[in-house]
């Protein structure tokens, strides 16, 4: 079978090479050994066969210029194969579906035999295909051109696996029937020659693809896109089951039918049929949601809601919360006078608690009565750092209460010279009796040695806290500016318990300004300016303890004798009390309230003026300076404030009276009267009166009206009949 196929292919190739226009031999017939199992064309009626012959003869009209030798065998060969193919497919479509589906499955298994034959043929023809294609393509191109003009025939390229192109022309219906069935069955025995194979391959090409390729592309560029396996299956036998529904779907669509299938546009209905448009809907009612926005701020949270994480707040609630926290922060800044609770208060600034006025007075009380337990050194440093930034927000609040009595701390470093450390407003407006009790507490309990309260020498209603400083020789390095003294005061304020720890007589000075906030042990070491006399820490502390004991003894003697001298009235200035030991003279201890003989006259005058008010007994003190003490009492403060308000209101009413009445005279009270009846006139210039109210007569008019002023300072006209002048004082 393979030798016969190869022999036929060689004949075809030799004829194309040698005789370019020579006709092909007659149609090749199948050998006797090949059985046609699926060919049932003999059972078809004669009428159906005649119709297909007419149709195939109509499609296969050859052009006039082609040679008769070539066209006649091709026509006969294609006609016979087309007839056989039509008969097979008609019989298969009329049969049962069960039998027809068995045929492609059985024939698909036999597709490998022609595929190998085709590959062997392609290998032998690759070497000689160049010369044979040129003349063949030219003739085929003329053939396709004529067929495309008639509109009844379409070309179909065929590409073998090796690259050989063979083209066959077939009718439109025959090719459409075999479009979607690539699996074809093979014959059981025998071999098939090249012209029937190429003819059967041409039948299975799509009409649309062949028509597009014939019009747009030249003949030499048309190539088959099918795979070798598909081509091998196309060269199989002619048995292929096709149903009637598939036959209808395989018929190519015409452009007219496609155009008719487009969706039809439906015109819009007219305005008359639709009628008038519907009325516009009314606006919704206005609803104020401001109350609902404020509601979450006041509603109390349940325990379950408190455990949940808080999401992003709305802008309104966020603003309310920030404002509330800001007020709370201010209130805690007021509450931060107690240095012991600074850390706890700094952490609780985000809380939303209200602080009452009584709680604001607690730091002032705790300042005079702090706990006597000593603090560790680490807590000291943290308190000092807290005090430094706490003092900044408290500074703008000093201007809010200018009438409060300030507290002044004074450091006596050289005899007769004082320096203001800073003014602080820890003291609130307290009655005179409470102030006296607090001074007693300070003198007896907290600061029994060196802290006393006095009035300022210039009588500016302030309190001076005098701290004693022991120095061997006064030097310029000990004199500090006001800024350095403020820092020193902050350090002293933060470490008052350390002052009690060292018996309240320690030195608060050092060689440099940086040492003012250091710990007291370092200050004690740096007490002497001479570096040669510096001693180790323990020995220095022992000496200081001895000095403090001597100071305590001398201070007690001084206190008792000063009371006796002042009570007897012998002298105002105190002499040098008691003999001092040699150690005291060497240390050069100088007391603030002791007048030494080594002072200059100017210093003596300053100290005397300061001591005259410091050493006055309590009874004489309040009797002599009662006016000054009244200014500190809250009753006197509110009384003066009320008087100022009344004065301002009177001035305002007077100004309004002059503008309204055009009164340019001096306002003088000429008489006083009591209203006996209510005023019946209710004009702009009339003064409303109440029976029994006392009025001051300012001026009279031409009519029976007088200008009066009531107790509130308002002016207006009053009838003379409504006034009674008998009760005047």
From Swiss-Prot:
Modified residues (Phosphotyrosine): 489, 591
PTM annotation, UniProt: Phosphorylation is required for its function in T-cell activation.
Motif SH2-binding: where in chain: 520-523
Region span, Disordered: 18-130, 170-320, 371-408, 469-490, 576-603
Compositional bias per record (Acidic residues), positions renumbered to this chain: 584-593
Biased composition range(s): Polar residues: 69-81, 89-99, 190-216, 226-240
PROSITE patterns: SH3
Stretches with biased composition (Low complexity): 473-485
Protein location: Membrane raft
GO biological process: cell adhesion mediated by integrin; integrin-mediated signaling pathway; T cell receptor signaling pathway
UniProt keyword annotations, A-Z: Membrane, Phosphoprotein, SH3 domain
InterPro entries: FYB1/2-like (IPR043443), hSH3 (IPR029294), SH3-like_dom_sf (IPR036028), SH3_domain (IPR001452)
Highest taxon above the source species: Eukaryota
All copies of domain SH3, residue ranges: 668-728
Family matches, as PANTHER family: FYN-BINDING PROTEIN 2 (PTHR16830:SF1), SH2 CONTAINING ADAPTOR PRAM-1 RELATED (PTHR16830)
Subunit and partners: Interacts with SKAP1, LCK and FYN. The phosphorylated form interacts with LCP2.
Protein name: FYN-binding protein 2
Species annotation: Mus musculus
Gene name of the encoded protein: Fyb2
């Amino acid at each position: 079978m393979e030798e016969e196929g190869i022999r036929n292919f060689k004949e075809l190739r030799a004829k194309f090479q040698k005789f370019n226009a020579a006709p092909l031999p007659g149609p090749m017939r199948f050998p006797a050994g090949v059985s046609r199992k699926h060919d049932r064309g003999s059972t078809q009626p004669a009428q159906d066969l005649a119709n297909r012959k007419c149709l195939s003869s109509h499609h296969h009209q050859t052009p006039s210029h082609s040679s008769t030798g070539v066209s006649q065998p091709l026509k006969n060969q294609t006609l016979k194969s087309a007839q056989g193919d039509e008969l097979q497919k008609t019989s298969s479509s009329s049969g049962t579906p069960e039998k027809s589906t068995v045929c492609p499955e059985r024939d698909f298994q036999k597709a490998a035999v022609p595929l190998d034959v085709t590959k062997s043929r392609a290998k032998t023809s690759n070497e000689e295909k160049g010369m044979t294609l040129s003349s063949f393509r030219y003739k085929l191109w003329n053939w396709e051109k004529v067929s495309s003009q008639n509109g009844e025939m379409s070309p179909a390229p065929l590409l073998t696996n090796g690259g050989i192109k063979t083209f066959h022309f077939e009718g439109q219906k025959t090719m459409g029937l075999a479009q979607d069935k690539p699996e074809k069955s093979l014959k059981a025995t025998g071999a098939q020659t090249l012209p029937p194979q190429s003819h059967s391959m041409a039948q299975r090409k799509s009409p649309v693809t062949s028509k597009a390729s014939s019009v747009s592309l030249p003949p030499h560029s048309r190539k088959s896109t099918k795979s070798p396996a598909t081509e091998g299956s196309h060269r199989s036998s002619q048995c292929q089951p096709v149903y009637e529904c598939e036959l209808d779907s395989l018929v190519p669509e015409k452009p007219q039918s496609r155009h008719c299938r487009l969706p039809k546009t439906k015109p819009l209905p007219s305005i008359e049929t639709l009628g008038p448009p519907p009325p516009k809907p009314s606006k919704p009612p206005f609803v104020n949601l401001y109350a609902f926005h404020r509601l979450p701020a006041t509603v109390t949270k349940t325990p379950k809601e408190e455990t949940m994480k808080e999401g992003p707040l709305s802008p309104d609630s966020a603003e309310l919360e920030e404002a509330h926290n800001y007020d709370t922060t201010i209130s805690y800044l007021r509450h931060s006078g107690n240095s012991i609770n600074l850390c706890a208060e700094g952490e609780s600034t985000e809380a939303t608690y209200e602080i009452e006025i009584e709680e604001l007075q607690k730091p002032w009380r705790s300042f005079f009565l702090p706990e006597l337990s000593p603090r560790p050194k680490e807590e000291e440093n943290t308190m000092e750092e807290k005090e430094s930034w706490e003092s900044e927000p408290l500074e703008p609040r000093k201007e809010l209460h200018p009438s409060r009595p300030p507290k002044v701390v004074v450091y006596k470093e050289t005899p007769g010279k004082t320096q203001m450390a800073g003014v602080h407003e820890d003291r609130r407006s307290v009655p005179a009796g409470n102030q006296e009790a607090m001074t007693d507490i300070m003198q007896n309990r907290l600061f029994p040695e060196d802290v006393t309260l006095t009035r300022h020498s210039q009588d500016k209603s302030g309190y001076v806290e005098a701290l004693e400083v022991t120095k061997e020789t006064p030097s310029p390095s000990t004199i500090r500016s006001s800024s350095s003294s403020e820092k020193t005061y902050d350090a002293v304020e933060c470490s008052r318990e350390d002052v009690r720890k060292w018996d309240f007589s320690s030195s608060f000075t050092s060689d440099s300004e940086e040492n003012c906030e250091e710990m007291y042990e370092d200050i004690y070491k740096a007490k002497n300016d001479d570096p040669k006399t510096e001693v180790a820490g323990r020995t220095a502390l022992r000496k200081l303890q001895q000095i403090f004991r001597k100071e305590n003894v001398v201070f007690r003697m001084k206190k008792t004798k000063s009371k006796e001298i002042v009570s007897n009235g012998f002298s105002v200035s105190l002499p040098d009390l008691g003999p001092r030991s040699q150690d005291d003279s060497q240390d050069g201890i100088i007391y603030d309230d002791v007048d030494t003989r080594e002072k200059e006259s100017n210093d003596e005058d300053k100290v005397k003026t300061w001591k005259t008010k410091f050493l006055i007994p309590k009874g004489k003190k309040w009797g002599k300076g009662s006016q000054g003490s009244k200014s500190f009492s809250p009753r006197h403060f509110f009384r003066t404030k009320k008087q100022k308000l009344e004065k301002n209101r009177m001035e305002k009413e007077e100004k309004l009276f002059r503008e309204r009445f055009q009164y340019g005279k001096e306002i003088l009270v000429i008489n006083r009267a009591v209203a006996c009846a209510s005023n019946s006139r209710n004009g702009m210039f009339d003064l409303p009166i109440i029976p029994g109210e006392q009025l001051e007569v300012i001026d009279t008019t031409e009519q029976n009206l007088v200008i009066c002023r009531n107790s509130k300072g308002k002016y207006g006209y009053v009838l003379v009949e409504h006034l009674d002048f008998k009760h005047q004082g």
